[in-house]
């Protein structure tokens, strides 16, 4: 049976990549595509919007009218929109892949609560390479973390609205958890003026916003006389889109639960 996928935010940069990824993947098909209420893109063919030709799927701004056309919703939009989509999916038993970042604690609690009813993959980054990096960071932190300074440096395009990136925060969380630290108290997100000497147990974050950078992350484990850097650079959003579709296919036989790309890629068994 073919898995029917809907895309939220179909007209955005990521939305168009997701349409392309669904169209090219085996075992899935594009069932619906959505934009915000009143968008000028409503009624446009999703395939033409994504530059791959006519698909016969018109962009809609009404999930209710399209609910019989999809089994799973992929959402890379904004937290407020995603939370509305979550409520709809819970009410209509639709699975979700969520790549939206910037949720506050209440938003994360809402996602966890929804996963009691439906199956959700929620990840800060759907790149296979980035999720492998998460595991490498845990290994490095275990060996070097208590003896070095740790800094997370990330760069994204000028249009990104949240900082640090969700991926950078996830990197920090993986490191902090490995070291038994709380990122809320050990994370340093701003340095300005006379800050005093750096504390050894800090996990620092630096953010760059410039031009059309798709996404770059680097973590330094810096000791006296040597430094280990673990980096990932994305050159195309298709890596995230393909990962999201892979996650959706993995969810097909799951009734409920909250998962991430570690589960999808079975990284805990490495």
Curated annotation (Swiss-Prot):
Residues making up the signal peptide according to the UniProt record: none
Top enzyme category: oxidoreductase
Gene3D superfamilies, sorted: Dihydrodipicolinate Reductase, domain 2, NAD(P)-binding Rossmann-like Domain
Residue positions of the active site: 156 (proton donor/acceptor), 160 (proton donor)
Positions with a binding annotation for NAD(+): 9-14, 35, 99-101, 123-126
Keyword entries, A-Z: Amino-acid biosynthesis, Cytoplasm, Diaminopimelate biosynthesis, Lysine biosynthesis, NAD, NADP, Oxidoreductase
Function per UniProt: Catalyzes the conversion of 4-hydroxy-tetrahydrodipicolinate (HTPA) to tetrahydrodipicolinate.
PANTHER family: 4-HYDROXY-TETRAHYDRODIPICOLINATE REDUCTASE 1, CHLOROPLASTIC-RELATED, DIHYDRODIPICOLINATE REDUCTASE
Protein's name according to its UniProt entry: 4-hydroxy-tetrahydrodipicolinate reductase
């Amino acid at each position: 049976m073919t898995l029917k996928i809907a895309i939220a935010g179909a007209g955005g940069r990521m939305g168009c990549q997701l349409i392309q990824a669904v169209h090219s993947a085996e075992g899935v098909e594009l069932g619906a595509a959505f934009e915000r209420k009143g968008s000028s893109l409503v009624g446009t063919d999703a395939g033409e919007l994504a530059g791959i030709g006519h698909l016969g799927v018109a962009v809609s701004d009404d999930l209710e009218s399209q609910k019989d056309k999809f089994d799973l919703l992929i959402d890379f939009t904004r937290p407020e929109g995603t939370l509305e989509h979550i409520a709809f999916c819970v009410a209509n038993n639709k699975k979700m892949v969520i790549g939206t970042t910037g949720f506050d604690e209440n938003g994360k609690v809402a996602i966890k609560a929804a996963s009691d009813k439906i199956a959700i993959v929620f990840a800060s980054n759907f790149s296979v390479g980035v999720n492998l990096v998460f595991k490498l960071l845990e290994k490095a932190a275990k060996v070097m973390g208590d003896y070095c300074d740790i800094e997370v440096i990330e760069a994204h395009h000028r249009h990104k609205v949240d900082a640090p990136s969700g991926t950078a925060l996830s990197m920090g969380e993986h490191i902090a958890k490995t070291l038994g630290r709380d990122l809320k108290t050990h994370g340093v997100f701003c340095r300005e003026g006379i800050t005093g000497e750096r504390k050894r147990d800090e996990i620092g974050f630096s953010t760059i916003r410039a031009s059309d950078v798709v996404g770059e992350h680097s973590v330094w484990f810096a000791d006296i006389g040597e430094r280990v850097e673990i980096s990932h650079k994305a050159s195309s959003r298709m890596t995230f889109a393909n990962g999201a579709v892979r996650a959706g296919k993995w969810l097909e036989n799951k009734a409920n639960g909250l998962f991430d790309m570690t589960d999808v890629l079975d990284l805990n068994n490495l």
